[in-house]
């Protein structure tokens, strides 16, 4: 809808399948740890001790930090990631507005170096790869707030004029790894924790703004008796009418009648 209104967004690595949902080949991220790691490897050269997974049977090389990106060899993976670093830096340094959508607090952590893998899935796991060095846990308020603060610190050093818009995803969990809570309770915990984090983060910085997409989808529209879920998506993703309602509110808040940013 931004493009339909005459706006553009940064598109690096347009050839790369992992850039379909982002301005560079970051793939989708589901937690603030994965977000923070993007900024740290882009600007600070940080790298996990176990950079690649090798599937035991197929030999496919998997990037566990960018969802499910697969290669035929380590050399191919390393070359692609080196190119990605250039594009990632260029995208973040040139951005005028950065939108961060907070999703989950459930994470899978490498016990060796505390890096967070994006998803415990893909050929490596399916083919019997060793997941013993990774542990599941629920991240908490202070950790998530610190992740956003570190992102702000890095952006302030490399692109201080950039504004950051924070939202919370209205897409709830459809499954949980927790043994102490059902999926509805786990989802409520994730969203309420991240909503509180977003509120505190926004209050600390003049260039950080909160946009209430979560509240519009999960509270306001149900109060009006309007459905928010797309048919055939297990009451999981929001429907097109909800998306349009949210985007109209977004334009009303941030864009004037001449399509100029407010």
Positions of the model-derived regions?
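Extracellular glycan-modifying ectodomains
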Residues: 1-262
């Amino acid at each position: 809808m931004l493009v339909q209104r005459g706006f553009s967004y940064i598109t690096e690595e347009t050839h790369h399948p992992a850039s379909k949902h982002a301005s560079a080949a970051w793939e989708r991220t589901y937690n603030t740890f994965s977000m923070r790691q993007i900024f740290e490897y882009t600007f600070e050269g940080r790298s996990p001790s176990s950079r690649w997974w090798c599937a035991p049977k197929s030999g496919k090389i998997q990037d566990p930090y960018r969802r499910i990106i697969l290669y035929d060899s380590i050399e191919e993976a390393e070359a692609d990631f080196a190119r990605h670093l250039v594009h990632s830096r260029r995208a973040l340094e040139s951005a005028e507005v950065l939108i961060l959508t907070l999703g989950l607090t459930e994470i899978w952590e490498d016990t060796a170096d505390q890096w967070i893998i994006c998803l415990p899935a893909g050929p490596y796991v399916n083919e019997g790869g060793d997941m013993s060095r990774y542990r599941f846990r629920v991240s908490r308020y202070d950790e998530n707030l610190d992740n956003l603060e570190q992102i702000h610190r890095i952006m302030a050093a490399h692109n201080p004029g950039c504004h950051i818009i924070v939202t919370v995803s209205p897409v709830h969990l459809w499954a949980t790894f927790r043994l102490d809570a059902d999926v509805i309770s786990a989802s409520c915990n994730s969203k309420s924790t991240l909503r509180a984090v977003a509120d505190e983060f926004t209050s600390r910085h003049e260039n950080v703004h909160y946009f209430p997409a979560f509240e519009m989808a999960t509270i306001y529209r149900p109060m009006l008796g309007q459905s928010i879920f797309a048919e055939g998506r297990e009451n999981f993703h929001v429907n097109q009418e909800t998306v349009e309602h949210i985007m109209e509110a977004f334009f009303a808040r941030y864009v004037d009648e001449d399509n100029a940013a407010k």
